[in-house]
Amino acid sequence: MNLEEHLSLGEFHVSNLIKNHISRGSPIQALVLYGGIRRRGVYFPGWVPLILRACACVVPRVVLGKLLHSESIKFGVCSDVMVGSSLISMYGKCGCVVSARKVFDEMPERNVATWNAMIGGYMSNGDAVLASGLFEEISVCRNTVTWIEMIKGYGKRIEIEKARELFERMPFELKNVKAWSVMLGVYVNNRKMEDARKFFEDIPEKNAFVWSLMMSGYFRIGDVHEARAIFYRVFARDLVIWNTLIAGYAQNGYSDDAIDAFFNMQGEGYEPDAVTVSSILSACAQSGRLDVGREVHSLINHRGIELNQFVSNALIDMYAKCGDLENATSVFESISVRSVACCNSMISCLAIHGKGKEALEMFSTMESLDLKPDEITFIAVLTACVHGGFLMEGLKIFSEMKTQDVKPNVKHFGCLIHLLGRSGKLKEAYRLVKEMHVKPNDTVLGALLGACKVHMDTEMAEQVMKIIETAGSITNSYSENHLASISNLYAHTERWQTAEALRVEMEKRGLEKSPGLSSLVLT
């Protein structure tokens, strides 16, 4: 159905269409739809709150939000309490608290949703004092959401006792299952699972979200056993519960369990949705299960599951890691509205497959699409430079991080050090290790040591080993690999006595080489 046909079905139909895009995790599609409508000169005030929600969802699009604010003033609907409250919420979620407060102060009429939006804006941006002031000011007409905004805010500030104190102050009649779940979320999100467990057992009415929240909490701290135990306690399981189980397995590297749960879920009559397939595709990518990945892709097409950015990225990532560049490219080219995450997946895919030049071209294409690269983008494109041996391009891209306001982390430094090392620039790489603002990890130091071995530079290798020995964070497996590398280097440069002495030292430490494992299942 084209845009004209959608418009012919009326404002209510278009509103539902926008809502569906947002609820399915495709706010960009909602913004594209609204843009097409406005280009045709059509305007309906009821759409504004919905589009403002979409603006707050998309890496917040505050510029578009401000344009909507201007349109609201132009069409005389800015004084509408729903529009005003939505503007406050949008500005708050985008970090523009001053603009949110300006809208709040200028509103001729406010309801409890307006106050809640302003309180939530302050709390989400770390201003508990002003939020508390408004909270006390609205004491007569507080509703459940008012209390929840404050409790959530204190939870984000890791002020758990204050959050619990507010929960205890909350009137009994307002303590619905949502309020209980928010307080539980404070414990879970701060990894206080013992406190969460005690609170969870006291919840009088547990819905699917409450059960899944507990499962997610245990999965987050890597306690798969307890998460699974919670799952088996749920009598009436639904899709939310199954999705939590599958996602938790995938996130903890239990790929086979995730795949088994995926098929068991369908066996019990539950149809996968976008969340399900995103998680199971991640499991397929981890375990190299191209056969299952292809089956999931077929299921997506057969059942009409929306290819939102999460599903698209998961498909690209799965095909890339399972060695199917052709299908990864096909999925990418089928995406009508490309996001930063989508381009990141494709750049990583090209880098994995040794297509460094194409990865750099994709990075350049992002600029033409007005997509701002993030830290993941730079890791992907620097990895492509390493694989392709593009030293000058890598140095230029690393410098560009500053202009894009992206602070390099240890992974970015690791890529650059690897690139310098491969190019024989060992002194420059060593200088970077000494000067970088983050502590070098095993991978970074191992990359430099490996480069020393390739270029037969024992003097530099010994300098690197001094850093490794004093780093204080080297695991046995990494120590063995580093020591083995320098021992081999001594042997290659015919320093036999030194090599033998190092081998003896390794034996004294009881270091053994850790075997590696790689798998890929094809059909």
Curated annotation (Swiss-Prot):
<feature type="repeat" description="PPR 11">
    <location>
        <begin position="339"/>
        <end position="373"/>
    </location>
</feature>
<protein>
    <recommendedName>
        <fullName>Pentatricopeptide repeat-containing protein At3g21470</fullName>
    </recommendedName>
</protein>
<feature type="repeat" description="PPR 1">
    <location>
        <begin position="10"/>
        <end position="43"/>
    </location>
</feature>
<feature type="repeat" description="PPR 6">
    <location>
        <begin position="176"/>
        <end position="210"/>
    </location>
</feature>
<dbReference type="InterPro" id="IPR011990">
    <property type="entry name" value="TPR-like_helical_dom_sf"/>
</dbReference>
<dbReference type="InterPro" id="IPR046960">
    <property type="entry name" value="PPR_At4g14850-like_plant"/>
</dbReference>
<keyword id="KW-0677">Repeat</keyword>
<comment type="similarity">
    <text>Belongs to the PPR family. PCMP-E subfamily.</text>
</comment>
<feature type="repeat" description="PPR 3">
    <location>
        <begin position="80"/>
        <end position="114"/>
    </location>
</feature>
<dbReference type="Pfam" id="PF13041">
    <property type="entry name" value="PPR_2"/>
</dbReference>
<feature type="repeat" description="PPR 2">
    <location>
        <begin position="44"/>
        <end position="79"/>
    </location>
</feature>
<feature type="repeat" description="PPR 8">
    <location>
        <begin position="238"/>
        <end position="272"/>
    </location>
</feature>
<dbReference type="Pfam" id="PF20431">
    <property type="entry name" value="E_motif"/>
</dbReference>
<dbReference type="InterPro" id="IPR046848">
    <property type="entry name" value="E_motif"/>
</dbReference>
<feature type="repeat" description="PPR 12">
    <location>
        <begin position="374"/>
        <end position="408"/>
    </location>
</feature>
<dbReference type="InterPro" id="IPR002885">
    <property type="entry name" value="Pentatricopeptide_rpt"/>
</dbReference>
<feature type="repeat" description="PPR 9">
    <location>
        <begin position="273"/>
        <end position="307"/>
    </location>
</feature>
<feature type="repeat" description="PPR 10">
    <location>
        <begin position="308"/>
        <end position="338"/>
    </location>
</feature>
<dbReference type="GO" id="GO:0009451">
    <property type="term" value="P:RNA modification"/>
</dbReference>
<feature type="repeat" description="PPR 5">
    <location>
        <begin position="143"/>
        <end position="173"/>
    </location>
</feature>
<dbReference type="Pfam" id="PF01535">
    <property type="entry name" value="PPR"/>
</dbReference>
<feature type="repeat" description="PPR 7">
    <location>
        <begin position="211"/>
        <end position="237"/>
    </location>
</feature>
<feature type="repeat" description="PPR 13">
    <location>
        <begin position="409"/>
        <end position="439"/>
    </location>
</feature>
<dbReference type="GO" id="GO:0003723">
    <property type="term" value="F:RNA binding"/>
</dbReference>
<feature type="repeat" description="PPR 4">
    <location>
        <begin position="115"/>
        <end position="141"/>
    </location>
</feature>
<feature type="region of interest" description="Type E motif">
    <location>
        <begin position="444"/>
        <end position="523"/>
    </location>
</feature>
<dbReference type="Pfam" id="PF12854">
    <property type="entry name" value="PPR_1"/>
</dbReference>
